[in-house]
Amino acid sequence: SFYGAARLIELLDAVKATGRLLKRAEVTVEVNPDSVRLHDLRALHKAGFNRLSIGMQSANNDILKMIGRRHSFRQVEMAVQNARTAGFDNISLDLIYGLPSQTRSDWADTLAKAIALRPEHISGYGLKLEEGTPMYALKDSPLIPSDDEQADMYLCMVEELRRYGYEQYEISNFSIPGYESRHNLKYWQLDDYMGFGPGAHSCIGRTRYSYVRDLDRYLAGVLHGEDMIDEYETIGDFERAAEYLMLGMRTVHGVSRAEYERLYRSDFSGIAQQLEEFIRRGWAVADGERWHFTPSGFLISNVLIGKLLEAQTDRKAEHNPWMKPQIERQPRTKLPPGEAEAFRDTYLNNPILTGKDRDSSK
């Protein structure tokens, strides 16, 4: 929305004029609560935008100020109200947990207020402190909630959103049934996608490419009809199979032996053995012919996916002995010791999460 409604509409009109936009297409625009007005929302909806993603982040105004956000929670409420008035019936709220000075009580209040706004979709992301950003100075600060506190916040989110009808379909994404983000699902299901602009990435079939990142160079090149592709690669079966594991296990749909072996002509047995180990530890479940992570598995998904990729590589080495020495030199991913027991003792016996103490927690 910072770009301005008029220019966003001009951009969408250019897309319509250049290609074929399906009538049922999901057309999302990200908006900041402080930079969107009712007349802008009406114009956007009339032009064909049909989904809003609103950056709420937190309901605590003090935390919003601390992280440099210019809006208040009241402005979030007004943005949602104006969006409904403008005709939007598909709204997503973005939330962040693990923020500086944020407590579990703060997070529970943010969740409650977000749910009360009745959006069709809610995304809840753990804070990531990126080097080079102003907040990176807080990396080792006691203001940042501990890993255990952030894990508690995550599991609280899963429980509360489920209780109010939001189904989890990916590590950080929840929706009323039928309102999953189709844009996001394209990535996780390895569908084709196209990006436009400096630094944008695309993947068509087995070809992945990106444009140059420098804005001035990109503009000059486009105006002169130059090819602005900066990086280009063809994806082989092994790499595509790895992406299938990485992206599939981010979702509750998970992965399937039949799909893996049919699509990539690769042996799934080593991966299946690793998944069975995850099941024994409480990190994954088998649902029919598919495997997917449990909430505790999602908490350490990066480590677990690393183990699955190692199982995939080990199986490849068995069929290609010449690769074995190189693979054996690679560092191995270590599973966190006692994670299953810690999860059981800390979370599964937590009366707030199990719902046994909800009345007394109000």
Please name every model-derived segment:
Residues 265-277:
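Short amphipathic alpha-helical interaction segments
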Residues 1-266, 320-329, 339:
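C-terminal scaffold of the Radical SAM
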Residues 298-332, 336, 343, 347:
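Short, amphipathic alpha-helical interaction segments positioned at domain boundaries
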Residues 290-294:
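Minor-groove-contacting beta-hairpin "wing" of winged helix-turn-helix DNA-binding domains
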Residues 280-289:
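A short, conserved structural fragment
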Residues 345, 349-350, 357-359:
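Intrinsic-disorder-associated, low-complexity terminal segments enriched in Asp/Asn/His/Tyr and depleted
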